Amino acid sequence: MFIAMDNNQKRWNCMEEIPAVTEGPFYCLACHSPVRLKNGSVLRAHFAHVKLQHCPYHHEAESFEHLELKASLYDWASKESHTEVESYLADFQQIADLLVVDKNLALEVQCSPLSLERLKERSDAYRANGYQVYWLLGKKLWLKERLTKLQAG
């Protein structure tokens, strides 16, 4: 995740400003569990749960591909429109990877398999709350020789 908050409720966005470790401790915006700043040489700076099992919104660690796609989309969309990354939508308890606020548009990056039921549930929730949603698929989910169950829908 790219967004976390500190003890003073300040939101930190690692794509805009990488905080010093001394600015922490940091917490997940959704579950308020501790997260740590990771700023190594392989992955771009991001936050990760200290213990992931406590967060109902982040079920697994985000892959390199997921982080990079989300960051690239944010860089692109934020040039033209007010865009928020990892925006928590309290009305239906969903975290949008990217939310283009002035267009009521949610952009979701999906790099790992997702059941058709869960995809429909999340898409329906966005639409019921006035958002248009686009799902952008990582390479593992691209169409190969035949349709997967999810693609056949």
Language model region names:
Residues M1-W76:
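N-terminal cysteine/histidine-rich coordination modules
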Residues E16-A20, L37, S72-A106, L114:
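Active-site metal-binding core of divalent-cation-utilizing nuclease and nuclease-like domains
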Residues S41, E65, A90-Q93, R118:
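Short secondary-structure boundary/capping elements
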Residues E60-A61, L107-Q110:
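Short, contiguous strand/loop micro-motifs
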Residues A96, C111-G153:
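Catalytic cores of nucleic-acid endonucleases
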